[in-house]
């Protein structure tokens, strides 16, 4: 069996290869990047639907925030939304209540695009008033305005390695118990002109 690590696994699994796509470290890199730009007050946009407290993207975010000594209140994590409209309303409400929020970290790029839309409707300038960062480097990240800073996972390499590992397991060949990849930060306009590099 081949498992992709998107949540914490606390047990030893037989005949299983774990694939670390870089989700955890990529999330930490998001926070480090925003912190270098002076951001200290974050909102975290979790995926739609039922939240998972063992999600390693969230764990990476929380671990890095803690390591940097940044205070992150539980109410600044928006999760459990059933649809985009609900998420949009919660984000707007939180931004209205707390004018010191200067960054939004989204679980994936579509949610980051929602944050850009909310900021625009509220008259906030991105990145001057609010930095926004996504995850996945989806096609939408290049077509929103401003262009979205995001994190790219090596999807083709991950898929190829997972398939090779699965075939090795089927053939009972020797195979590593864990395969790790590094995610890449793609810096665009949504997180500050001073660190902007074209991708």
Task: Please report, for each region that a protein language model flagged, where it lies by residue.
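Flexible loop/hinge segments that line or gate small-molecule binding clefts
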Residues: 1-26, 110, 136-148
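Hydrophobic beta-strand scaffold residues
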Residues: 1-3, 72, 126
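Conserved beta-strand scaffold positions in the cores of enzyme catalytic domains, especially
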Residues: 2, 16-18, 44, 75-77, ...
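Short beta-strand/turn micro-motifs composed of small residues
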Residues: 4-6, 20, 46, 79, ...
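An alpha-beta-alpha
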Residues: 28-70, 75, 178-191
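Short beta->alpha junction loops
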Residues: 75-85
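Flexible loop/turn connectors
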Residues: 92-198
